[in-house]
Amino acid sequence: MSGPGATAVGIKVKDGVVLAAERRMSYGGFIMSKAARKVFKVGDRMGMACAGLYADMQAIARALENEIRYYEISNKRKMKVRSAARLLGLILYSNKLFPLMTETVFGGYDDEPRIFVLDPVGSVIEEKYSAVGTGAPLAMALLDKEYREDMSLEEAQNLAIESVKVASGRDSLSGDGIDVLVIPFGGKPSIRTVSLEA
């Protein structure tokens, strides 16, 4: 994806989901912000990490949150993670003639943890781990090498942080800290910020 840069990753393990993204918002060579949160909680057991245009990230996070809330109130039941990912794909696809320029890793749990990757026009692909953005090739190299299905949630957090650090070290459009969203299976999501120097 050309344009604004970023690195966002997602990892699924048996104990939950980890989503992480760096905090730099840049356009070309200009850094507009060093504190742009590109990781979003969605409901009480889902979230997304994004790369692309910051306003588009915020718009799809709000739209998806509202649609899920409406569904859950109307139907008196929780929306499945796969259904929420498909809904996000429909939101993106409905704008295909004027796309929302955001690549997204979406994850959460219902009967099991799940991760989905979406492109700006709504393609939905289920994965065990993934990276998006300008730093994705660097992050994926580490994820491909180090990911194991039997990892603990803590090991997945460390791998997500390290993969974003590696990408930020070489991708000038990524940097300035990492936001990490941890969604433990059966638990509540939590976000923390990690320094790139840590």
From Swiss-Prot:
GO terms for biological process: proteasomal protein catabolic process. Transmembrane segments: none annotated. It is found in: Cytoplasm. The active site is at T7. GO terms for molecular function: threonine-type endopeptidase activity. It holds the Pfam family Proteasome. It catalyses: Cleavage of peptide bonds with very broad specificity. Keywords: Autocatalytic cleavage, Cytoplasm, Hydrolase, Protease, Proteasome, Threonine protease, Zymogen. GO terms for cellular component: cytoplasm; proteasome core complex, beta-subunit complex. Its EC number is 3.4.25.1. Residues 1-6 form a propeptide. The formation of the proteasomal ATPase PAN-20S proteasome complex, via the docking of the C-termini of PAN into the intersubunit pockets in the alpha-rings, triggers opening of the gate for substrate entry. Interconversion between the open-gate and close-gate conformations leads to a dynamic regulation of the 20S proteasome proteolysis activity. Belongs to the peptidase T1B family. The 20S proteasome core is composed of 14 alpha and 14 beta subunits that assemble into four stacked heptameric rings, resulting in a barrel-shaped structure. The two inner rings, each composed of seven catalytic beta subunits, are sandwiched by two outer rings, each composed of seven alpha subunits. The catalytic chamber with the active sites is on the inside of the barrel. Has a gated structure, the ends of the cylinder being occluded by the N-termini of the alpha-subunits. Is capped at one or both ends by the proteasome regulatory ATPase, PAN. Component of the proteasome core, a large protease complex with broad specificity involved in protein degradation. This is Proteasome subunit beta 1. It comes from Ignicoccus hospitalis (strain KIN4/I / DSM 18386 / JCM 14125). The gene is psmB1.
